[in-house]
Amino acid sequence: PEVPISATFEGNVLYVEFTTPVGNVDIAIKDATQNVVYTSSMDVTAFGQQVAISVENYQAGTYIIEFRNSKDGYVYGEFTLM
């Protein structure tokens, strides 16, 4: 099934767009050692709703971004900063 999330970078900002309303979502970014470097919660109530996450102060390396909602939905992605 299609995942209702897309993510793009513009400079040092990661833009996450939800392509369908999914309710309350917890967002976490973890570094390569599983340390949580970012957390946020938001209520996604509209098509195309976005969040902008600055990664300006992150070290170079690989990160995992995780999304969880109250209906036991879970999806993750990986990105690398140079």
Residues covered by each model-derived region:
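Short, glycine-anchored, charge-dense loop/turn motifs used at functional sites
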Residues: 31-35, 63
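Solvent-exposed serine/threonine-rich low-complexity stretches and specific carbohydrate-binding patches
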Residues: 37-45
